[in-house]
Amino acid sequence: MGSLLPLLGISVVSAIFFLVLQQPEQSSSAIILSLKKRHGSSSGSSGNQYSSSRPSAGFQGNRSTCSLFLGTWVRDNSYPLYKPADCPGVVEPEFDCQMYGRPDSDYLKYRWQPQNCNLPTFNGAQFLLKMKGKTIMFAGDSLGKNQWESLICLIVSSAPSTRTEMTRGLPLSTFRFLDYGITMSFYKAPFLVDIDAVQGKRVLKLDEISGNANAWHDADLLIFNTGHWWSHTGSMQGWDLIQSGNSYYQDMDRFVAMEKALRTWAYWVETHVDRSRTQVLFLSISPTHDNPSDWAASSSSGSKNCYGETEPITGTAYPVSSYTDQLRSVIVEVLHGMHNPAFLLDITLLSSLRKDGHPSVYSGLISGSQRSRPDQSADCSHWCLPGLPDTWNQLLYTLLIY
């Protein structure tokens, strides 16, 4: 598959974390172009403008100035790209917002418009041909599962005649495109490093990853993520003890712990993954929308979180919380320190504008009594499907195909 993504990563992980839309960014597509030459291969909108049709099938725009991860959301009545019924059994209840009573649908009608270029239309048949005989592995937390289910639906809905097979399990769930020999899996590993049971305690081992990584090493395309679970406390905390070296801790600075774990992951990638065969990506932090003060000027609901939000944030500033910024910075620092950096699929900024895209109380995991208390129960972390993760996968598709 070549070395496109690692080279792109060198640019992205070293970029400044831009909070203002107009600030300059090194062009990701310029690097795409230079790499295509090396391998011998031969305008942005503002505001919520209405578009009556999708961009044309291929990449359009100036590759030397295109900024895939900076841009704006534009209304597009040809969206969404699929319905859950197009991929039966794939979208789980926690992401199927329309099934569980979400009364509005405008949040489905937005398309990401990068600066100085258009994203190509997702073509499932083309993706299947490109990835024929390959194994794709998503590894991480439920945001990775969000993206995995989205990618399956994008492919199945645009190439409905292909034979498929799905098995769900813990930690591994797998979807197969039988006619193309493609295996696409999700492996649940919210911290990436191992958690072992020791004398009845869940021990998070910051220096060990082989227990999880044994499931990853044969993949041709690896997409990793971690982030949200490092902030959980109380009953939501994912460990009882943390082991670092020969020492055990009940807790430690969460950013320090995350960095240690990611350096263990990075060392594994550098020493166990054949980068001439396998491409490695890392999904940046998917932001939450639990605090309306982050977007107060454009709040449409007056609620205490994402509940009732029905449209994206407009304007030129990206409302990224300091905590999200710090989590992302840990990832950037670790990737930048790699000899051959994984490519950062940098969805943080564009996702921060989508306060309207979360399940809120319209999730199959939220009970009726919880729905009556949206200020306490709304899910403002995950994303509805169809929805925002479809754009993450359009970006992935663009990088792989173009």
UniProtKB/Swiss-Prot annotation:
Keyword Transferase listed:
no
Question: Which compartment or compartments is the protein found in?
Answer: Membrane
Where is the motif (DCXHWCLPGXXDXWN motif)? 379-393
Question: What are the record's GO terms for cellular component?
Answer: endoplasmic reticulum; membrane
Ranges of Low complexity composition bias in the record: 41-56
Region (Disordered) residue spans: 40-60
Tissue expression: Expressed in flowers, siliques, stems and leaves.
**Motif GDS motif at which residues?**
140-142
- UniProt similarity note: Belongs to the PC-esterase family. TBL subfamily.
The protein's name = Protein PMR5
Give the organism the record lists. Answer: Arabidopsis thaliana
Q: Which gene encodes it?
A: PMR5
